[in-house]
Amino acid sequence: MSRPRRRGRDIHGVLLLDKPQGLSSNDALQKVKRLYNANRAGHTGALDPLATGMLPICLGEATKFSQFLLDSDKRYRVIARLGQRTDTSDADGQIVQERPVSFTQAQLDAALDSFRGDIKQVPSMYSALKYQGKKLYEYARQGIEVPREARSITVYELQFIRWEGDELELEIHCSKGTYIRTITDDLGELLGCGAHVIYLRRLQVATYPTERMVTLEQLNELLEQAHRQEIAPAELLDPLLMPMDSPVENYPEVNLLPVVAGYVKQGQPVQVAGAPASGMVRITEGEERKFIGVGDIADDGRVAPRRLVVEYFD
């Protein structure tokens, strides 16, 4: 007879994990899920195993709003190795070409400027994007290259940090869907020497504060502390979570009377005085401004529910 699956906790919020190098985003997610004994968990945009930094992990009902973080801006610090190109565009791949580094600072400045603003980017074959239902990296590992369409991205800021010998360090603030490995590879080709990523750290996702990031080591230490003090781990771990509505905190708020919120919870659009004319809104209920979900402004001006928090249904 199979053993019944142990039920986890109904815990809701967002943990800003500082992902360590060498760990996949999914492995990091599973570790956090176990530490919190959470029923549900999901991350908001994978980091390569080589990369470190901010990986927001949504727990419970917060998973419904993870897409809004996938769509948000990101900020990275990257160090590129000049003179070498790899098949994956990072240090985890095989070197496929070596060339001398012979450009000038003026040439570097001009090359960097071409990557600022609205640009087109062809995703790497070593990415999780799909072609005919199969991930690109699965083709790449079989030595197969498939067509990829250039995608529109925005590089809001590309800051030169340092250039020492064969190392180039940059800070990049970019839109969703930007591959830093691809920017590095394309820059290396433009400079005529090739380049690949040897260090990558995600500094920020959306407007989340970097000082709220926590490591797996810190989480395990708190778990051990809870055991020593004979208290529930939740007492030490749960205060680290950002609110479940933090992925949508920048959307305009529409506050509803409880009786009106009742219609929204049943999936019905409602007319709200003073609501924005269009776009997404964050819906709250009553004087306590309890978060109940997000909605769209319909063509007729009503607030139509889009994603709702089930646990608040009566």
Curated annotation (Swiss-Prot):
GO MF annotation: an example: tRNA pseudouridine(55) synthase activity
Name of encoding gene: truB
Binding-site residues for substrate, renumbered to this chain: 43, 76, 179, 200
Active-site residues, as the UniProt record annotates them: 48
EC annotation from Swiss-Prot or TrEMBL: 5.4.99.25
Keyword Transferase listed: no
Keywords, in A-Z order: Isomerase, tRNA processing
HAMAP family per the UniProt record, alphabetical: TruB_bact (MF_01080)
Gene3D superfamilies reported for this sequence: Pseudouridine synthase, PUA domain
Substrates-to-products reaction catalysed: uridine(55) in tRNA = pseudouridine(55) in tRNA
Family: Belongs to the pseudouridine synthase TruB family. Type 1 subfamily.
Organism: Serratia proteamaculans (strain 568)
One of the protein's GO biological processes: tRNA pseudouridine synthesis
Protein name as annotated: tRNA pseudouridine synthase B
